[in-house]
Regions:
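Short secondary-structure boundary/capping segments
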Residues: 27, 73, 160-164
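Conserved Nudix-box catalytic region and its N-terminal flanking loop in Nudix hydrolases
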Residues: 76-121
Length: 198
């Protein structure tokens, strides 16, 4: 620039440079830390796990209700004995663990439909929702409510071949009780083998 002062902008960080220690850091998201109605942060909670929570800004009370999970108990008549269909998980939680087929109940979904849907999604085995009957309902300490649906027994030869799905490496038959990936699955399977869900 002729006869004028040249002004330079402040230095710009190159990709890979460390941010300045005084630069504002992004906020870490904390689940359930703000009111779902107005967005104000919850303040003056007696503890991080205190529920229900009332927003001091808008007065709305929030509850942390259990997440319902539908789990299938499908008896299979094998050549020597009768067992239950189980899957091997390929996703977290408990990736690599053996479990009963199951998953979260969708919004406005009937629990019997959820049992049949989860069985199909995780094993490829079709079942009619109207054939599902309540075997048990159990709660865990993580805030889940597991609803175990019992289906009529089927011969092993009538099932489709076991193939991997989006969440499992396929299905297998459990012929005796043993520890499963989730304690409540272990409890429900043991109860079935003991004759309490037949």
């Amino acid at each position: 620039m002729r006869g004028g002062t040249v002004r330079y902008s402040p230095p710009v960080s190159e990709p890979g440079d460390s941010p300045s220690p005084t630069a504002p850091q992004p906020l870490r998201y904390e689940r359930n830390s703000h009111c779902g109605t107005c967005g104000a942060p919850y303040t003056a909670l007696p503890s991080a796990d205190a529920w229900p929570r009332t927003c001091t800004h808008c007065g709305t009370t929030a509850y942390r209700n259990p997440l319902p999970v539908a789990v299938a108990l499908l008896p299979v008549i094998g050549p020597r004995s009768t067992g239950l269909v189980v899957i091997t998980r390929t996703i977290e939680p408990q990736k690599g663990g053996t479990a009963l087929p199951g998953g979260f109940i969708d919004h406005a979904e009937d629990w019997r439909h959820a049992v049949a849907r989860e069985l199909r999604e995780e094993t490829g085995i079709e079942a009619a929702a109207q054939d599902v009957r309540l075997a048990d309902a159990l709660s865990d300490t993580d805030g889940h409510l597991l609803v175990f649906g019992l289906l009529p027994a089927r011969p092993l030869a009538s099932l489709p071949p076991s193939t991997p799905t989006d969440e499992t490496s396929g299905y297998d038959i459990l012929y005796s009780p043993r520890p499963l990936a989730f304690p409540l699955h272990t409890e429900a399977a043991a109860a079935w083998f003991a004759g309490r869900h037949r």
